[in-house]
Swiss-Prot record:
Is an aliphatic amidase with a restricted substrate specificity, as it only hydrolyzes formamide. GO terms for molecular function: formamidase activity; N-carbamoylputrescine amidase activity. It holds the Pfam family CN_hydrolase. This is Formamidase. It comes from Photorhabdus laumondii subsp. laumondii (strain DSM 15139 / CIP 105565 / TT01). GO terms for biological process: putrescine biosynthetic process from arginine. It comes from the Bacteria. It catalyses: formamide + H2O = formate + NH4(+). SUPFAM superfamilies: Carbon-nitrogen hydrolase. InterPro entries: Aliph_Amidase/BUP (IPR050345), C-N_Hydrolase (IPR003010), C-N_Hydrolase_sf (IPR036526), Formamidase (IPR022843).
Length: 338
């Protein structure tokens, strides 16, 4: 159960707003500051329009954009203690709202590739979840694969929150990992271009249905002089049905009223639909208690570091390909000759 969301919500309802943020055009670090200020102003205006709002979600790359020529250089990156993050913290406190934000995060080892990161900040201005993208969109994205797993945190109104970033959501294993750890509201922030528009909608729905959890997904919108980004924020019920879906408009605010307790009750009381439970105790009618032994070859091989496809040797693209023929560039921004 859920509703499309409005300006008010009752006590058990989690009122959430997903912002189809216009894709930023970033030519240097000064442009990042402009976007950070605009994100914070957007929080102020959205809360003013939706006074009962609990949670606001911004897409991947909303602060730092997708300028692939410079996006890995030092000046283009942020850390959790950067002043820009303090701006997000203050905006959450000022508006008494939780927020999800995207940053391209410096690696602790400056000789190593940066991370693509999402953070959740609570209404007290505290970072309560820190996630690094597990599945960068190769070969376009150069980011270091995440090393923090799939964390889950307590949220408002009974929500148990997890975040994935863009292409992560194409892997059913990652949504299942979040659900297995208790998540009942799974957030997906994205900077996808139109190549995978339909697949975006399918996976938002299947991630919800297969795990009996709400999914809240939002993408950048607009054109950045290279790609067009499709917006289409999608909020799905725990039965996989769409509660609310945006169009392709930049600045569209996709809202919904969620009831996390109902997702929990579905997990506890549904039978035929309870795939996440049935996965681990197969055929509990024919075999009391169900069969619990691992029966999946790929699970065993992945756990042993031996994951290999039958066609592995024929896979053509497995490095930086035409996007990074000379490798990923690190260090300070190159000086432009006068």
């Amino acid at each position: 159960m859920g509703s499309t969301g409005s300006v008010s919500a009752w006590d058990e309802a989690l009122l959430i707003a997903a912002i189809q943020y216009p894709v930023p055009i970033i030519r240097g670090p000064e442009d990042i500051q402009v976007q950070v200020q605009q994100i914070c102003k957007t929080m102020d205006s959205t809360k003013a329009g939706y006074p009962d709002l609990d949670f606001i979600v911004f897409p991947e790359y909303s602060a730092q954009g997708l300028n692939t020529k410079i996006w890995t250089y030092d000046e283009m990156l942020l850390s959790l203690d950067s002043p820009e993050i303090d701006c997000f913290r203050r905006a959450c406190i000022r508006n008494d709202v939780w927020g999800v934000f995207s940053i391209m995060e410096r690696n602790e080892d400056p000789s190593q590739i940066p991370y693509n990161t999402a953070i959740i900040i609570n209404s007290n201005g505290e970072i309560v979840l820190h996630y690094r993208k597990l599945q960068p969109w190769v070969p376009i994205e150069p980011w270091m694969p995440g090393n923090l797993g799939m964390p889950v945190c307590e949220g408002p109104k009974g929500a148990k929150l997890a975040v994935c970033i863009c292409h992560d959501g194409m892997f059913p294993e990652l949504a299942r990992e979040a659900a297995y750890k208790g998540c009942n509201v799974f957030i997906r922030i994205s900077g996808y271009s139109t190549q995978v528009n339909d697949q975006w909608i399918w996976t938002n729905r299947t991630n919800a249905w297969q795990n009996l959890m709400y999914t809240v997904s939002v993408n950048l919108a607009g054109y950045d002089e290279v790609f067009y980004y499709f917006g289409e924020g999608t909020i799905c019920n725990y039965d996989g049905n769409i509660i609310q879906q945006g169009q392709r408009n930049p600045w569209e605010i996709v809202t919904a009223e969620l009831f996390p307790r109902l997702a929990d009750k579905a997990r506890e009381n549904w039978a035929l639909e309870n795939s996440i439970f049935n996965l681990g105790c197969r055929g509990y009618v024919g075999k009391p208690g169900g069969e619990r032994a691992n029966y999946l070859t790929w699970v065993r091989d992945l756990a042993n570091g031996e994951y290999k496809l039958p066609w592995d040797e024929n896979i053509r693209i497995r490095d930086g390909w035409k996007y990074y023929p000379e490798g990923v560039k690190l260090g300070p921004l190159p000086k432009i000759d006068e």
